[in-house]
Amino acid sequence: MERPAPLAVLPFSDPAHALSLLRGLSQLRAERKFLDVTLEAAGGRDFPAHRAVLAAASPYFRAMFAGQLRESRAERVRLHGVPPDMLQLLLDFSYTGRVAVSGDNAEPLLRAADLLQFPAVKEACGAFLQQQLDLANCLDMQDFAEAFSCSGLASAAQRFILRHVGELGAEQLERLPLARLLRYLRDDGLCVPKEEAAYQLALRWVRADPPRRAAHWPQLLEAVRLPFVRRFYLLAHVEAEPLVARCPPCLRLLREARDFQAARYDRHDRGPCPRMRPRPSTGLAEILVLVGGCDQDCDELVTVDCYNPQTGQWRYLAEFPDHLGGGYSIVALGNDIYVTGGSDGSRLYDCVWRYNSSVNEWTEVAPMLKAREYHSSSVLNGLLYVVAADSTERYDHATDSWEALQPMTYPMDNCSTTACRGRLYAIGSLAGKETMVIQCYDPDTDLWSMVNCGQLPPWSFAPKTVTLNGLMYFVRDDSAEVDVYNPTKDEWDKIPSMNQVHVGGSLAALGGKLYVSGGYDNTFELSDVVEAYDPETRAWSVVGRLPEPTFWHGSVSIFRQFMPQTPAGGRGFELNSGSSDVDAGHHRLPQNPEELQ
């Protein structure tokens, strides 16, 4: 039998070598052999050691011994402010890789590890202290963590405080520095059962020292999400508060909140604003609502589904009570949804249905002045506009009445509409022609005019249109391309294409993003994909799936009550009768801001 040829190279490694080396160095230290430096801790206690071991274990000692300072050659180095027992632990760690962190040594050991640059020991101390957080020490622990740049511990302390803010004592909260209180109020994770509690927290802090703190009240009130404070509380308490009544910036915030609750504030036509985002602990969430459409078999649907992007959950809402037919239009006005017109194939509808999200039911409201189908609807300044080729009318939900307006100057077929910067825009092809145009309606003059915005993109027919952050987005129905128009600058742009086409899909703005759902994809298969576009990252991502593949459905966003998202072990901030105008015994949350009456 032929012997195998000998190997030219035999790779070898000993997995126990590192541990054996550490043991050998530790033994040399115990036997006091080859020691070449002595560290003197606070109090004069000496610790002989090996320079090479210290330099390998700590960037602090590496810089000390490798540089040109006197300590690089000195046989004795004095370490000011390092307790001897902490230096002992760090030296033992250098030679063994082990350290025992306890309640007695965690804080001083973290200080010493931070000073002498032992990051692993510092991290271990921080992890130990995270487990020791409680109501008595959480505020001080956050101060300590931030002072020593211990980010993990600082974040854990903040989460604990936000989660247990309702259990902290009044004295603890009132002694907070302004910057810290603002940080808590601005955080989505502040655990309050309703926004009035956040308002009371800010007010209590100011009232603890009015002469010094009153000047900070506008800044604090801006951090409170006033649009989600109940309407009666806004009128009875916020508006009546002298700190608000005497402050123009505060009155502007109050007016913004009241406009929001009266559906006069279009949050999609503004830039991102934290005040328009409810806190998860209150149970309110901005949701995507899908109405009607057709399924795989082209059967008409009367289902109404809602999607919570925070949890990824779908829920059923009250079904549409009548035959939807086709050619209807869907729009959200405040937190209610309106379905206008349509037909059954032989008869046009003038009926208007309203979905009241606070009670989860559909009711019929005043009919349109004219029956119509394949029209478009939008909301501008709290009023509902319906636009068709030959007529325009406007609905006032406060009076439940319709008003005829000037029709478009140039009739358009199957137009789409959106409100932007105080104007109503209609996009479509001129009646009987293939020419695509944009017309604009001015509510102050009741006049339509042609928009001269240069060469339009090559649309085959009217794209789906929505306004987000003051920009108009146009999603093509026959391709994945998306165009953007800035009416203020009169500029066109193109954003990255969608992941797929959505022929017959639906478009809505929600939470500062665009949501496109359903329709037929690139392979002509009916799709259940929901994808979202984030303007900050300029990227599309698939965020969910429809309950079933659907097309020709409508989608809008509203705020509605979901289960409060309170972290485990947390309790919402509650106001007791001794320090609040709110009845702490009644914490039923409103279904939406319009219930705040």
Curated annotation (Swiss-Prot):
Subcellular compartments: Cytoplasm, Cytoskeleton, Spindle
GO cellular component: Cul3-RING ubiquitin ligase complex; cytoplasm; polar microtubule
Keywords assigned: Cell cycle, Cell division, Cytoplasm, Cytoskeleton, Kelch repeat, Mitosis, Repeat, Ubl conjugation pathway
BACK domain sequence ranges: 138-239
InterPro entries xrefs: BACK, BTB-kelch_protein, BTB/POZ_dom, BTB/POZ_KLHL21, Kelch-typ_b-propeller, Kelch_1, KLHL21_BACK, SKP1/BTB/POZ_sf
Chain intervals for the UniProt region annotation (Disordered): 570-597
Domain called BTB: residue spans: 35-103
Protein name: Kelch-like protein 21
Source species: Rattus norvegicus
